[in-house]
Amino acid sequence: MENNGEMNAQPELSVDITKTYMYEKLWNICAGPLCVLPKPGEKVYYFPQGHIELIENSTRDELDHIRPIFDLPSKLRCRVVAIDRKVDKNTDEVYAQISLMPDTTEVMTHNTTMDTRRPIVYFFSKILTASDVSLSGGLIIPKQYAIECFPPLDMSQPISTQNLVAKDLYGQEWSFKHVFRGTPQRHMFTSGGGWSVFATTKRLIVGDIFVLLRGENGELRFGIRRAKHQQGHIPSSVISANCMQHGVIASVVNAFKTKCMFNVVYKPSSSQFVISYDKFVDAMNNNYIVGSRFRMQFEGKDFSEKRYDGTIIGVNDMSPHWKDSEWRSLKVQWDELSPFLRPNQVSPWDIEHLIPSSDISQSSLKKKKHWLQLNEIGATLSNLWTCQEIGQRSMNSPISVPEFSYPNAIEDSKFLSGLLLNHSLLAIPNENYNSDQMIQPRKEDITTEATTSCLLFGVDLTKVSKSKDSICPIESCKKSLPQDKKFDQTQPLRSPKEVQSTEFNFTRSRIKVHMQGVAISRAVDLTAMHGYNQLIQKLEELFDLKDELRTRNQWEIVFTNNEGAEMLVGDDPWPEFCNMAKRIFICSKEEIKKMKLKNKFFQPESKALTSSDVPPNVTDN
């Protein structure tokens, strides 16, 4: 397994699942919580710009003179063939070798985990102190971890002790003497029992992390995670001088043109340049602009996870020679200082989009205030038309509206008239009651004494004003308005449910799209489309289906309306579909059959959309 100081941290295929899982678990712990590797067979985007940055640890100027030599896109769509978890024997630092195949839809991969059962693994990790790495000291182990990870000690002895044998990531065995002694009594690896030799050989220093695992069969394995200031770049034993700069790009270009497999080396502490397809698409859907707020996760010098917020101050190419590259395309400004260095330019998939809490609270407050106003006006007008205490008149009786004392009385009367005629927030007891009977000039005073008060905009409608100027007939207000702004009083009244539905239709532009078997949802803007053709094309791009939705051999597109009914996309004219659709689902044919059997699926008389029903230039139906 050894090759120029390079060790494969994965066992051969003949090794049982327990040992394989222990290797992967130990490697992942040593790599850190921020390291995310793709899975074999997964679709990814490979960014050569990030690969060069990792290998060369170069500046932007050094990257600039490489790109013009080769005709290579800023990103390559690939599929993962295999992943080898490796460790550098000289430093015990872990890294991964990822095998990629450019632009292929099907790749045969070796399934090294035939059993889906996850073995039980106990582990602990400890940041080493000065006492732990001193020649005269030993490794002190917390009691809880010693009980979980080590065989039980014989407590009947004056000094409980046992000898343990553990293997490192590349299979070398090390012996440690585990004792339980001292005042107070503690579990520890003694310096004379092998720990001192181990610490010296591995060149352990303060801040390194010692990780130990115990499998179901009692096997012990350990790894080392170097302190932040001691972590280096890709080991020179892994990448020879011939593979630097031009060699890396040349090998990728050759693989891209010949459609053959190529390998890339990934170090956990570096920026991720092999990105999952779903993660990339989800990041691009955020539409980051200047001024957008974000949060990014880091690992501190003490290996604790930290999150820092910032603001995007620029969106552009990091290098002029890599046009339209998303690699570090966001120039950022951080809110606060940090004890470690942070990048000034980041990639969209490395950050989390934030919506300012102040904007959320203000938006919700405005919406709440708006609905409160409408509800109050609706309740007042409903009382105005239904209460019998005002003069004990029927609904056919004429009514006058007091004049408003502030200057915008005409505009407010316009609002009131529109509210009465268009929003229909009041209850209508008589179907034959028309708007001409609703609003008439006042011809007589109300003589019946009111028993209750009814306020409209702070004015008591039950009190009879003695001033002639206090009454402004609606007709006079309407005459003062321009001809083109007069309201049509013959417009039919609509129910509150219709009004509410209309208002929601105007505010809903982006709706969620869920695909069966895909964890991450997408969002589409129906207002930016002109027909079903564009919708299907957009969905195929988002989920990488390649005409599978148009042919309808495997998938069907379903949507839910405001009432939760599930219907096939294509049964309704495009404008009606845009108004009704609340969520879109891409389901398999089998799932549609199950929905029909459970009577959960609503089928109108017309058939669903097929590829033949949609001509190439359909725009609105």
From Swiss-Prot:
Tell me if Nucleus is a UniProt keyword of this record.
Answer: yes
Indicate where this protein is primarily found: nucleus
Q: What's the domain of life for this entry? A: Eukaryota
Q: Which SUPFAM superfamilies match?
A: CAD & PB1 domains, DNA-binding pseudobarrel domain
Q: What is known of its domains?
A: Interactions between auxin response factors (ARFs) and Aux/IAA proteins occur through their C-terminal dimerization domains III and IV.
Protein family according to the UniProt entry: Belongs to the ARF family.
What is the official name of this protein in its record? Answer: Auxin response factor 13
| Organism of this sequence | Arabidopsis thaliana
